[in-house]
Each structure stands twice: as C-alpha cells, then as structure tokens.
Design a protein with these regions (language model features):
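A residue-level marker of the well-folded mature domains of exported/periplasmic proteins
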Residues: 2-5, 10-11, 21, 29-327
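Cleavable N-terminal signal peptides
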Residues: 15-16, 26
Length: 327
C-alpha cells in the first residue's frame, strides 16, 4: 500500500471509529424530550384493584388535565404481558413520553427497551425494573417513588421496639418479582436477622390483595398457631389478615400484632381501632412529581437516577390526625 493510500485509509478508519463511538454514546443515553407547551404522554398502570392504585391513577389524570396534556391511559389488570403490550401500543400511538409503573422488575425490561429504541423517554413511577438489565439515564430517565427498603426497615424497627425484640412472625409478601415486594422484604428481614429473639416462621405472597391476604393469613395461622406478629407488605393484605385473625378467634392488636405499609385510609382507621399497630406511608399521589420531572428533563436539567418521595409513619399517636389526608 502506498504512503498516500495508507494515510487515506487511516483517516477513513479514524472517521469511521468516531462515528461508531458517537452512535454508541448516543444510544447509551435515554431518549431526549423536546420542549413543548403541551405533551401527549402515556401512563401504563399495573392494576386498579385497590385504593392505592386508584389514588395514583386519579393523581396522574388530574395533573395531566391541569396541564392540558393528552394522557393515554392503560390498565394491565395485573398482567406483565399485557403491560408490555400496553407500552407497545403507546409507542405506536406516538406519545412523547411514557410513565410506567412496572408490575414486575424483569418482565417489563422489553417494554423499556422498545420505548428507548423508538426514541421515547420512559419515567418509572412507584415500581422499578431490574437494575442489572436497565439503567437510569441510559435506558430510562429516572425512577420516581419511595424507598421500599427503608419502608421495610422502619416496619421492622417499630416491631423490635414494640415487642422488646421477641416475636414469632408471619410475613405476607407483595406481588412476586415486584420491586416493592423484593425491597420491603429485604429491609424488614435484615432488621429481624439482627435480633435473635425474633423469627420469621412463614413468608408467602398475598399479591398486595386484601382477600388473598386474608386467605394466606388464614392458612399460615393454622400452620403456625404460635405466631405473635404479622408483617404485611401493604395495608390491603393487613386488613385481610385482621379478618383472618378474628376468624381464628384471636384479637388483632393484642393476641397478634400487625405492622404494614402504605398508609391508606382503611389502614389508618384500623390503627385508630387498635387492630393495626403501625403503617409506613407510601404516598400514591405521583402526578405533580412525575410531570414536573418530565418538564425539567425537556429543559435539559440534570435528573437524578432516583427521585425519592418523603413518606410519613403512622401509629396510634397520629393516625386520627392524619386520616382526613389519607386516600
């Protein structure tokens, strides 16, 4: 090869390499969002079978209406497969951005990646996806929600203090594979593991559902009549557990303590009634924070990988004062 040809080849190779690197860097970033007065956005809800989800949906719809945005809303009815299809439908409809509350961490990865490929930014709200498979700032913009691990930790710490570090515990888990179920279990279980006088004798999913929580609690109470505590990953299952305890001829709040998460109105009423010991808040009113994040992102502002909500803790000392503000 002549000197001239070699030089020309090297220049071409450098240029090609720069183009490839540029493309790789561009693909390593989450899709951009153009600045507009109004947006057409999608909200892919996971289900609508409990007060928490209904409150979240109401907040997202109300804030979109307030801003004058067009909202494409879908309800996956508890199906990860349908939620993936819902996101694909939003992509086909040409939405500007997608707000996704993933039912489970792994099955919703294809939906996130499909939106990225289509150039549509995704904002995860309430629930997260598997962090080993998708990254904030690269595959989606950010996660907006509560610190589920901290929620579980707070529930565990309250229980240690209340029981003096002695308890036989039944755990009612949320939807299998979901980030709140995974993290609320970890946060709580880690606290219990540090207290030798406390033992989790059974842990089973109640799918965040009141009636399923009741059924699972009934079964586990029969298998473990020595249980003194039920930890539920949400108030709906805790309320189901109250019914199960009463059906077993025991007194909730006395014979068996219950601690849970969410802070819904029925949960706070159960605290007032002395049946539920405490509930860690997980605020469902995401509308203002979700849309504010999108507006800031469009303006080019730096969005953190996680936008963590500030939640409260409810027990007998404040439930009566706070119930009017609950959902």
């Amino acid at each position: 090869m002549s000197h001239f040809s070699r030089r020309k080849f090297l220049k071409s190779a450098v240029a090609t390499g720069a183009m490839v690197l540029s493309a790789q860097l561009a693909f390593a970033e989450a899709p951009k969002l153009a600045v507009k007065a109004k947006y057409k956005v999608g909200f892919a809800q996971t289900e609508s079978n409990n007060p928490w989800r209904l409150a979240q949906t109401a907040s997202m719809k109300a804030e979109a209406e307030k801003l004058g945005w067009q909202l494409v809303y879908t309800d996956a009815a508890g199906s990860a497969a349908k939620q993936v299809a819902d996101v694909n439908s939003m992509i086909a409809q040409g939405v500007d951005a997608i707000f996704l509350s993933p039912r489970e961490e792994k099955p919703l990865i294809p939906a996130v990646m499909a939106a990225k490929k289509a150039g549509i930014p995704v904002f995860l709200i309430d629930r997260n996806v598997d962090q080993t498979l998708a990254k904030a700032g690269e595959d989606y913009v950010t996660f907006i929600g509560s610190d589920f691990t901290l929620e579980g930790k707070q529930a565990g710490e309250w229980l240690v203090k209340t029981t003096g570090g002695k308890a036989v515990i039944i755990e009612l888990e949320g939807s299998t594979g979901s980030s709140p179920a995974n993290d609320r279990k970890k946060g709580f279980d880690d606290v219990i593991a540090q207290n030798p006088g406390m033992k989790i004798v059974a842990s089973q999913t109640g799918d965040f559902n009141r009636d399923k929580g009741r059924q699972v609690a009934e079964s586990l109470l029969q298998a473990h009549p020595e249980a003194t505590v039920i930890y539920a990953h949400n108030d709906e299952m805790a309320i189901g557990a109250i019914s199960a305890i009463e059906a077993a001829g025991k007194v909730p709040g006395k014979d068996i303590l219950i601690v849970s998460i969410d802070g819904e109105k029925d949960g706070l009423q159960a605290i007032i009634d002395g049946k539920l010991g405490a509930s860690v808040e997980c605020n469902p009113k995401f509308g203002p924070a979700a849309y504010a994040a999108a507006i800031a992102y469009a303006k080019g502002e730096k969005i953190p990988a996680k936008v963590v909500n500030t939640d409260r803790f409810f027990d007998a000392s404040n439930a009566a004062k706070m119930i009017t503000d609950s959902y």
